[in-house]
Each structure stands twice: as C-alpha cells, then as structure tokens.
C-alpha cells in the first residue's frame, strides 16, 4: 500500500462527485454552495480515507484566512486573559489560529486592528471590552448623588453627578476590567460599528462580548441579575449597611452591576445612601482609593473616629477592585471581615487564593469566550447568548449576628 497522502481527487472519485464539488464541500466557497447530501457524502468519504485538507487551499476557496482576531484592552488583566483562553480553545477546535490585539485602552488601535483584520481577510473577529452607558442622569455608576473617590490616598467623596469619565473609550464593548484612555481625535463609536459591519458584509464573522451593538451577535453577561442575587444573599447573612465601589462613570458593566445590587437592596429596605456609592477607576488602585475614602470619612482607627460610620459591607463591582479595597483596609490597620466585609464580582481564578477568601459572583469567562467564538464562526443558530453568574460566598462575608 502506498504511503502517499490521500489527494482531493481520490476523495472526489471515491465519493462519485466532480473535483470542483469535492473542493467546495471540504474547503468551502465564497461564491457557491453544495447540496447538503453531497456535502455529507464527500465529508464522510474524506474521513474514511483520512484525507487532510490543505489550509492554504481552504483559505483561497473561502476567500478567508485561518486567522481569528481577538481584541481586548489588556491581556495582562486576568478578566481578559481568561476570556482569551476560552476563545483560543474554541478556535483550535475549528482549526483556526487566534491573532490577539491588546489595545491598551486605545480606541484608535481598536479601530485599526478591525480594519487590518478586514484587509487581511481574517475568518472572524471578536471584540471584548467595555461600553459607555447612556448619560441619562440615572442612579447607576456615576448617577445622581454618587460619590467620587480621589487619588491613591483618597481625597474624599463628593456628591453629585459627574460627566463622562475621561478614561473611557469611544466604544468598548463590556469590560469587567479597566477604563479606556482615548487620545485627541479618538474615533467615534459609529466609526468602529461601521468597520465591524464592513468586515461582516465582506464575509467575515463578528461577535461582541458585552452589550449589543445594532444587530451584531453578542454574548451578554447578566450583570444586573448577578449583582442582585449577591445583594439578596448578603442581606440574608445579616448585613444592613452597605457601600458600593461603583467603577467609572457611565461604564456600562459598572452601571449594570451597581444598579442590580442597589436595586435589590432597595426592595429589601437596605439601600445604601448616595454618598456611599463611590465612582472610581475599574482597577485595583481604584478600589484602594475608594475604600480609603470610606475609611477616612468614617474616622475609623482615629481617636475621634466612630467605627459605626463605616459600612458593614463594601461591594466592589469587580474582583480586582475588591482586592484593592481589602488592601486599603489592611493598610489602615483594620481587618476584613472583622471591621468591614468585602465582596466582588467575576470570580477571577487567579484571585481565588486571596485571604480571606473573597465572596463574589462567578462568571464562566472561558465559556463566554467559547460562546463568542461559536457566534463569530456561525456555529450557533442563535443571534446571541446570555451567561448568568453564580453567587459564591466565602470568608470575606461571614454571617453577621445582629
């Protein structure tokens, strides 16, 4: 028996179809399709003969390369790296290679990468980032009455509504992580949306992780529902006085989580006062700063301080901020959970060894990445998907005796 590899001609002959039909069935085609029964016959024959398609031929036939582009703000952020791992595994199963762009919060680089992927005829592109919420004066993150944390030392909280956070990008589709820093002349959200639609209209696949943009496929995280579930669980443990580290003003993810948490507490009669909903950066340092503001304002740890002015529990809208808040408590000579309890959101796997263990809402981020990949490649019949979180109670929020 010959050791020569099986050729496409052999597959076509064995399946009883023309070489062109066999090529279209196996490699795909940008212009012509194959009847489903013929395609199945060819694919079954290829499997039986152990035929290995030529990736270059597939790319030429489809008019697409085997690259899948993934755009994130910061690959060093564990939120994005976990999503990227899920994308990479799903892409590997599809025989694709992931091309990663870490934009460092630059909307110019974000737009440039989408246009580069279109020029290079990548198979698909996935955007994972954050998105601006409408500036409607609502009570979400940065809504009316929200406080504002100062610098690393915590310059205090001020009431009142703020404008758009200067660090936010023109279009960042759901982060769970850091804010953007647009430069002068940053592209608008319309420009990025137009680039994504042009990529799709040229035959590429597109998926977003976060909030929907027009009719583009999206994997949404049920942020408000998860935060509401957490609020109810913490209230059930006996907590009544809460504060929220709400993230950047007008950041969609932060707003959804803040609104879900405070809304559930309002229904339970334990809504935090507006001055205890603090806007801050969506980072470890942002959490540290906002927590320091709460501690300094309460006077806890000082001769004239009143420990009763410190909230019983502080909810940070992501885990990284929660870790910063816990560090601020420690640096102030206080203890989590003895002096104040802390909870986060996301259940970042690299933070699960934090002591005390952090109560949070677990989001299956790798699954989110895999779902987005399936949407981008057209492997799902759905126009989108939604992922719901699970409350995980740990040592940072023990049951409170009242």
State each model region's role.
Residues 2-3, 55, 67-232, 236:
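Alpha-helical recognition/docking segments in bacterial nutrient-uptake
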Residues 55, 73-82, 101-109, 131-132, ...:
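Hinge/beta->alpha junction and helix N-cap segments in small-molecule ligand-binding domains
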Residues 1-63, 145:
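N-terminal helix-turn-helix DNA-binding module of bacterial transcription factors
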Residues 240-241, 272-276, 335-341:
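Short acidic capping loops at alpha-helix termini that bridge into adjacent secondary structure
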Residues 295-402:
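Flexible loop/turn connectors
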Residues 14, 19-24, 61-74, 233, ...:
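Short beta-strand segments enriched in small/hydrophobic residues
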Residues 122-130, 205, 243-245, 277, ...:
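Periplasmic-binding protein-like
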Residues 110-121, 288-308:
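Short, well-structured alpha-helical segments in soluble
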């Amino acid at each position: 028996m010959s050791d020569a590899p099986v050729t496409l001609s052999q597959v076509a002959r064995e399946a009883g179809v023309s070489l062109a039909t066999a090529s279209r069935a196996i490699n795909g085609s940008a212009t012509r399709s194959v009847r489903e029964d013929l395609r199945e016959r060819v694919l079954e024959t290829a499997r039986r003969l152990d035929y290995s398609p030529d990736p270059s031929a597939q790319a030429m036939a489809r008019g697409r390369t085997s690259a899948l582009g993934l755009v994130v703000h910061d690959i060093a952020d564990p939120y994005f790296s976990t999503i990227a791992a899920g994308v990479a595994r799903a892409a590997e199963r599809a025989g694709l290679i992931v091309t990663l762009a870490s934009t460092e919060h630059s909307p110019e680089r974000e737009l440039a990468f989408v246009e580069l992927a279109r020029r290079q005829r990548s198979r698909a592109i996935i955007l994972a980032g954050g998105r601006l919420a409408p500036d409607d004066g609502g009570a979400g993150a940065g809504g009316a009455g929200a406080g504002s944390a100062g610098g690393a030392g915590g310059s205090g909280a001020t009431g009142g509504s703020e404008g758009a956070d200067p660090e936010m990008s023109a279009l960042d589709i759901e982060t769970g992580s850091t804010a953007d820093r647009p430069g002068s002349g940053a592209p608008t959200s319309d420009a990025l949306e137009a680039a994504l639609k042009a990529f799709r209209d040229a035959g590429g696949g597109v998926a977003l992780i976060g909030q929907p943009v027009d009719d583009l496929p999206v994997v949404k995280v049920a942020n408000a529902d998860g935060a509401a579930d957490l609020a109810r669980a913490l209230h059930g443990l006996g907590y009544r006085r809460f504060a929220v580290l709400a993230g950047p003003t007008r950041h969609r993810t932060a707003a959804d989580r803040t609104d879900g948490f405070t809304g559930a507490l309002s229904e339970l009669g334990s809504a935090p006062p507006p001055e205890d909903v603090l806007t801050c950066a969506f980072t470890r340092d942002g959490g540290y700063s906002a927590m320091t503001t709460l501690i300094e304002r309460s006077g806890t740890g000082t001769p004239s301080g009143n420990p009763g002015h410190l909230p019983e529990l502080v909810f940070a809208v992501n885990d990284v901020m929660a870790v910063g808040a816990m560090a601020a408590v420690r640096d102030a000579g206080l203890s989590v959970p003895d002096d104040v309890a802390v909870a986060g959101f996301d259940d970042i796997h690299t933070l699960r060894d934090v002591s005390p263990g952090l109560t949070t809402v677990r989001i299956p981020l790798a699954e989110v990445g895999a779902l987005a990949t399936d949407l981008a490649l057209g492997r799902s019949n759905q126009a989108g998907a939604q992922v719901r979180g699970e409350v995980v109670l740990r040592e940072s929020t023990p049951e409170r005796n009242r």
